[in-house]
Amino acid sequence: RSGPAELSHILKDSGAQAWVGAAPDTQYPEVPQLPVLPVRLHARDWHHVPEPSPRRTAFVLYTSGTTGAPKGVLLSRGAIAAGIDALAEAWDWTDRDTLVHGLPLFHVHGLVLGLLGPLRVGSRLIHTGTPTPEAYARARGTLYFGVPTVWSRIVQDEESARALSGARLLVSGSAPLPVPVFEKLRELTGLTPIERYGMS
């Protein structure tokens, strides 16, 4: 969750003009006040809108872990589609899969792969809210996404880790997975975790 200084920078740098959906629940005086465009979740789409060019920007995602203020990275529709399609082919990710994760939806891992990926591939998605070992174990998925912190917690709960042995793929991203965690995860699940790097 971004603090007030980072949120203010991102809104100003991106040229954001409105909140889509609900306004943020925390108001900071230094954060620009923007109009709210509510989203009616029950409404049907009756507009026909032409398909935008693959070169059009789909997202401006802000980097993390950099020195200085976060930097906005423009991701095109075509780049996002190509990235998802390449991983779907490499991982044999299909509409028969159930993806499980509890990652935040403001990074490439959670948003692009964890939300847009299942929509593009047609697979089922279970978002656990919080990525706890117990939530991952209960979900009974075929693919699991996590970051090193999530996997570190999972290997500390051996019963939950063993419950993931029915999956076909464990994916770690966003930072390097420590070797001891990698090895313990492989030992407890019988699966070799796959590491991936983000687009931003």
Predicted regions: what is each one?
Residues 58-85:
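Conserved AMP-binding A3 loop
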Residues 1-18, 71-74, 101, 123-130, ...:
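Short beta-strand->loop structural element characteristic of the AMP-binding/adenylate-forming
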Residues 57, 63-66, 99, 105, ...:
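Conserved S/T- and glycine-rich ATP-binding loop of Class I adenylate-forming
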Residues 24, 78, 149-152, 175-176:
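Alpha-helix/helix-capping structural signal
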Residues 141-146, 155-200:
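Gly/Ser/Thr-rich phosphate-binding loop
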Residues 44-62, 69, 92-98:
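Conserved pre-ATP/AMP-binding loop-to-beta segment of ANL
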Residues 1-50:
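Structural core segment of the AMP-binding/adenylate-forming
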Residues 81-98, 106-142, 157-158:
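Conserved AMP-binding/adenylation subdomain of ANL enzymes
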